[in-house]
Swiss-Prot record:
Its main location: membrane. The gene is Micall1. It holds the Pfam family CH. Keywords: Cell membrane, Cell projection, Coiled coil, Cytoplasm, Cytoskeleton, Endocytosis, Endosome, LIM domain, Membrane, Metal-binding, Phosphoprotein, Protein transport, Transport, Zinc. SUPFAM superfamilies: Calponin-homology domain, CH-domain, Glucocorticoid receptor-like (DNA-binding domain). Homooligomer. Interacts (via NPF1 motif) with EHD1 (via EH domain); the interaction is direct and probably recruits EHD1 to membranes. Interacts with EHD3 (via EH domain). Interacts with RAB35 (GTP-bound form); the interaction is direct and probably recruits MICALL1 to membranes. Interacts with ACAP2; the interaction is indirect through RAB35. Interacts with RAB8A (GTP-bound form); regulates RAB8A association with recycling endosomes. Interacts with RAB13 (GTP-bound form). Interacts with ARF6 (GTP-bound form). Interacts with PACSIN2 (via the SH3 domain). Interacts with DPYSL2. PANTHER family: CALPONIN HOMOLOGY DOMAIN-CONTAINING PROTEIN DDB_G0272472-RELATED, MICAL-LIKE PROTEIN 1. The modification Phosphoserine is found at residues 293, 307, 464-465, 478, 480, 613, 682, 732. Residues 425-434 have a biased composition (Acidic residues). This is MICAL-like protein 1.
Amino acid sequence: MAGPRGALLAWCRRQCEGYRGVDIRDLSSSFRDGLAFCAILHRHRPDLLDFQSLSKENVFENNRLAFEVAEKELGIPALLDPNDMVSMSVPDCLSIMTYVSQYYNHFTSSGQAAASPPKPGKDPAAPSPTSTSPAVQPGEEAQGDDLSPDSLSEQGKPQPPSSACAACGQRVHLVQRYLAEGRLYHRHCFRCRQCSSTLVPGSYSSGPEEGTFVCAERCTRLGLGGRSGTRPLSLQKQQPAAAAEAKDGEDSDLSKSVVVVAAEADGLQASSEVQPHTLTKPPLPSKPQDLASPPVSRPTPAPRKASESSALTPPTPRPRSSLQQDGMVEQSVSGDLVNGRLQELPVPKPRGTPKLSERMTAPRKDPPWITLVQTEPKKKPAPLPPSSGPGPLSQASRQVENGGLEEKTQKSPAAEPEPKPYNPFEEEEEEEEASVPAVPSPAPAPPETTPKSLHPWYNITPTSSPKTKKRPAPKAPSASPLVLHASRLSHSEPPSATPSPALSVESLSSESSSHTANTEPSEPPAVPKSSSDPAVHVPGTPGTSANSVTPSAHSSLSSSGELGQPSGEQMPQARTRGSPGTHSTKPFSGATPTPFLLAGDQKSPAPPMGSSSPQMLIKSSCKENPFNRKPSPSTSPTVRKATKGAKPVRPPAPGHGFPLIKRKVQADQYIPEEDIYGEMDSIERQLDALEHSGVLLEEKLRGGANEGSEDDMLVDWFKLIHEKHLLVRRESELIYVFKQQNLEQRQADVEFELRCLLNKPEKDWTDDDRAREKVLMQELMTLIEQRDAIVNCLDEDRQREEEEDKMLETMIKKKDFQREAESDSKKKGKFKTMKVLKLLGNKRDAKSKAPTGKS
C-alpha cells in the first residue's frame, strides 16, 4: 500500500527488524504484546530500557513500560491503555496508527533516522508469525500490509470497557482521550471540582471526594464564574452531542499530551502538593503599585497570585517585583525595632517642636542637631537664679540692645561677621529668613503657665518667635550652665516676679546669623580667631553694662535683642528690614538678673542643677536624624575642638548591615498573568475546534471509505494530531512559565523578609527570629530547587521541540525534492529524446550542405 498507512507500516518494519519476538505484519495485532513499541524505543534510545529483559507473555508490563517511557522521556502522550491491550485480542487499528505516528514524528529527524541495528549479542532471531502473535485470529493475516476501511470500521464497532469516561460515562473518542491516575477522561470532563477549569498535569491535586480533583494554580483566582468555568458549558449547549464529546476529549487529550511534560516534572507536582502555600495558598495583589492594600493573612509575602476578590476579572500584570506591600510592612516593622529611637520624639509638646514627619517634609527652621556644635556647655548644670532686683539687669540689657541696634544700623564691619562663626548652618538660616516674616506670632500667654509649673527656667515660651516654635533648641536653657538673657521677655511676657528665663546660645547664634543674612546676605561667614576665645561674662550687678562687652559679644547680644522683639504686637516692626532702628526698647520689669556666657567659655564652674530631665531630652533630640545635616562650613571644625569634654555618642546609621532592597530574581522576560491566561483561553478554543474536527474525522475513518479518500483522511488525521500536540505542548510551557514566575516572586519575597530579619542586630534577636530564619532559609532552598527543576524541564522540551521542527522541515524538503526530482526526470527524459534527434538531424544537414557550399 502506497498510502500513509503503508508508509507507516514499512517504517515500523525497518525499526523492529532484527529484534527477538517482534514481527510487524499489521498495525493492530502485531503491537498487542508491546514488544514492538519497546523495540522502536530501544533502537533509537537504548539507554531508556533493557529489551533483553522483556518477556513476550507479559503483555501488560511491556505496554506499560513503553507508554511510560515514551511519555516521561520523549513527551509522547499515552493514547493507549495497557489494560486495553491485554483485554482486546485485536487492538484498535486507528489508535495504534495514531500512537505510532507520534513515534515516527519524534524519531524521523535527520540525525535519528539512520539508527544502527541491534547488537549481535542480543540474538535477534526473527520468530515465526505464530510465535509473534499467539492470539492471532484467522482473519488477521488477511489484513497484512493493506488494511481495508472495512477493517477499521469493524474494529471501531466493539467498545472496550475502558473507552468510557470515568466522569460522565460516555464514549471517549481517540482525539479526546486523557489518562489520569489510571482512569480515562474527556478533557472537558477532567476539570476542577471548585472552579470548573480544565486541569493539567502538575497543577492539580485530589479533591475532597474520591475521584475528584482540584486545581492548585487557579482555583482561588477564578472562582465559579471564572475564566474557563462557564465557557465550555455554554459551548456544550450550542454544539451537538458529537461536538460536546469532542470538547470532552479535548480535556482528556490536552491533559494527556500535557502529561508528557508533567511527567518530566513529577517532582514539581509533588512539591506543589506538599507545599501548596509556596505557590497557591496566599493571595497577592496583582500590581506592584497596590502597596496600600491591606496585608494578607499569612506570615510571609505571597507569590503573584490574585486574591479571591479578583475572581471575576483576570489579574493585571505584575512585574516581578511582587508583593512589595508586605515587604514594606515588614521593613517598617524591622525599622521600628532597629531604629526605635528615630520613631519617637522626646521633645515635650509645650515646646512646640514639630513631629518627625513634619521635619522631613517641611524645610527646617532650625536643625535640632545644632546643639551638637555646642554640646559641652549644655552638660553643665545651670545656676539657680538669684533673687536680686530686676532693675540693673534691665538697664544693662537695654544698653546692650540699643548698642547692638545702632551697630546693626551702621553696618559696622567689626560687628557683622563676628556672630556668624557660631552658626555653621547659615544656608539653612537664609532659607528660613525668607519664609518667616509671613508667619504671625501667636499669643504669649497660654504656653506661659505650663513651663512655670515645671521649672523656673522654662519661662522661655515658644511664642516669642516663629523660629523657636519649630525647633527644639529653646529647651536647651534648662540644661545649659550659663545663658545669655536678652530683652526677649520684655515683649513676650507680662511683668511678673518670676525669675527671668534663659536663652540658649545656639538660638542667639541663629538669630544673629539670620539678621546678618537679611542685611548683607552676600557676606561670607567669618572664622573665629580661636575656639577658646574668652567669652564675656556679664554678672547680674548694677556695675555691668554694655561697655564691658567685647565687640563680638556685643554684636551677639545686640542680635539677641531682635530675638526678643517679635511679639503679638511688635512682629511687623521687628521684621521690617528697612527700619531696624525702630525696635522697641522698653525695659522688662519682671526679670531677674541672669549671668551671660557665650559658648566659648568652658572654664567657668557652675553649681549643680536640681533637675536633669531637660538635659536627657536634649540628648535624644540631637539623635533624631544625623543624615540630613548639610556639610558644615569651616567654622564647625573649630567649634568641635572647643568641645573637648564628653562628646555625645553618635547614633548608629539607620539600618544594620546591607540596605533593604528587594532583589529581582526573574530569569526570563516576565509574562503578565493576564497574557498567560489569555493565551491559554485561545489554546483551549483551538483545542475545542480540533477535537470536534477529530471526532468527525474519526467517525469517517471508521465508517468506511474508498482507498483514495481514506489516504487523504489519514493525512488530515495525522496533521490534526500533530497540531493538537503542538497546542498541548504550548499550554504545558505556559503552565511552567506561570509556576516559574510564582516561584521567582516567592523567592524575592523570602529573600526580602530574610534581609529584613538579618538587618536587625543580633543582640536584639529572639528565639522566634532565629526559628524564622531557619524556616526562611529552608524555604529559599526549596524554591531554588523547584525553579531549577522547571528550567530543566523547559530545556528538555525546547530541545525536543527543535528536533521535531527539524524533522518536519527535513521531511518536507525530502518530499519536495523527490517531487522535483521526479518531475525533472520526466522532463529531462522527454527533452533528451527529442533533443537528440533534432541535434543529430541538424548535424547531418550541416555536413551535407558544407561540401556543396565549398564547391
